[in-house]
């Protein structure tokens, strides 16, 4: 592996935040408790008095964290905010975070070292999971479930193949470890196009997969909170509302132009071939999103009906099933709340600090 210059920081984490002080306090306190070894840049565009509280929190935690708090105007576009924060990163590798999610510190160094040793890769991540809190809870409370959040390895030799594969079964690369210069340039492209929130994450991810391969390593990397509603400007419309919006096609056309240009440079193909590849990739993406939305809606309806029927027929079923399930043997890499709370789980050591930060409980008992 190539050596970095002496004293150059390996990696940094950028956390955009907006009007969610409880989440920001939760994640920064988690990092402080673990003596997080890398620079954290907080990119805050909250309204007052939330911004004041966030600044005070950052000042309080600076003795435990290498923390750089940056304030931006409340109306700044998210792509502008991330781009400006990325210009402050001095390390060769970077990962974006979110104020309501947890990046596992132990996953970052292996990701950066993998990129250092593999110049044909642009994106690295580990296992990703999500957790759900009991109804009514916001930033703290009992965790009621844990599930796997899909991440992928994409290793085709051409940017066209990688782009098509990526959008055929889209998974986010937002939280992955990236090369700083590449990610900064990719977000600058998104900022210049003034994209809406449905497109703004897609473009940097697509550019990254054109520029290099994607690798999923072992180990827990990101633990996300799943919740239906939140105080944020980034709540996304349904896929059908997004497609039929009058702004959709002009933005898609701008993205197609940019991605086609990137493909001609990366693969040495004609502009016509590149535009066809982009079109094919987005057709597959939209098909996948529409099918997934329909499947999710049907699944929710069926689940509600089944739960109601079971609850009527068998009083106490839910409580009894949880008790029995906790006693059942599971594999060491199983993704479930019951599995994660067992010391035999490969995820136990990385998950428990997050569990404590969210629930205030020291163990799963």
What are the roles of these predicted feature ranges?
Residues 182-187, 194-218:
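A short, conserved alpha-helix in the catalytic core of glycosyltransferases
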Residues 94:
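Short aromatic/hydrophobic "clamp" motif used to bind/position activated sugar donors
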Residues 11-23, 27, 34, 43:
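A conserved hydrophobic helix/loop-capping motif in glycosyltransferases and polysaccharide synthases
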Residues 129-131, 135-136, 174, 210-211, ...:
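Active-site donor/metal-binding and catalytic loop motifs
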Residues 144-168:
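Short, flexible, basic/aromatic active-site loop/helix in glycosyltransferases
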Residues 29-70:
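Acidic donor-binding segment of Leloir-type glycosyltransferases
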Residues 72-89:
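Glycine-rich, basic loop-to-helix element that forms the pyrophosphate-binding segment
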Residues 108-144:
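Conserved donor NDP-sugar-binding/catalytic core segment of glycosyltransferases
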């Amino acid at each position: 592996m190539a050596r970095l210059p002496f004293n150059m920081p390996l990696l940094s984490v950028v956390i955009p935040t907006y009007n969610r002080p409880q989440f920001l306090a939760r994640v920064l306190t988690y990092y402080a408790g673990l003596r997080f070894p890398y620079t954290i840049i907080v990119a805050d565009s909250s309204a007052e008095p939330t911004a004041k509280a966030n600044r005070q929190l950052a000042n309080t935690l600076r003795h435990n964290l290498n923390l750089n708090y940056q304030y931006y105007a409340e109306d700044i576009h998210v792509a502008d905010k991330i781009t400006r924060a990325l210009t402050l990163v001095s390390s060769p590798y970077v990962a974006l975070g979110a104020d309501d999610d947890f990046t596992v510190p132990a996953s970052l160094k292996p990701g950066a070292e993998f990129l250092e040793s593999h110049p044909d890769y642009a994106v690295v991540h580990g296992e990703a999971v999500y957790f759900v809190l009991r109804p009514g809870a916001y930033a703290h409370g009992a965790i009621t479930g844990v599930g796997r959040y899909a991440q992928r390895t994409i290793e085709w030799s051409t940017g066209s193949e990688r782009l098509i594969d990526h959008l055929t079964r889209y998974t986010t690369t937002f939280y992955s470890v990236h090369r700083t210069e590449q990610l900064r340039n990719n977000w600058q492209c998104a900022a210049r196009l003034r994209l809406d929130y449905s497109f703004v994450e897609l473009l940097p991810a697509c550019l990254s997969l054109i520029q290099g391969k994607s690798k999923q390593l072992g180990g827990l990397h990101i633990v996300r909170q799943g919740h239906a509603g939140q105080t944020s400007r980034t709540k996304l419309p349904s896929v059908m509302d997004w497609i039929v919006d009058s702004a959709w096609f002009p933005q898609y056309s701008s993205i197609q132009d940019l991605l086609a240009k990137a493909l001609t440079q990366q693969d040495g193909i004609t502009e016509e071939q590149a535009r066809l590849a982009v079109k094919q990739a987005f057709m597959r993406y939209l098909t996948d999103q529409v099918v997934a939305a329909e499947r999710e809606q049907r699944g929710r309806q069926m689940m509600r009906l089944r739960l109601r029927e079971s609850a009527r027929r068998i009083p106490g079923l839910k409580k009894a099933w949880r008790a029995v399930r906790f006693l059942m043997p599971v594999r060491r890499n199983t993704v479930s709340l019951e599995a994660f709370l067992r010391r035999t789980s490969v995820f136990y050591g990385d998950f428990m600090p997050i569990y404590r930060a969210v629930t205030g409980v020291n163990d799963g008992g």
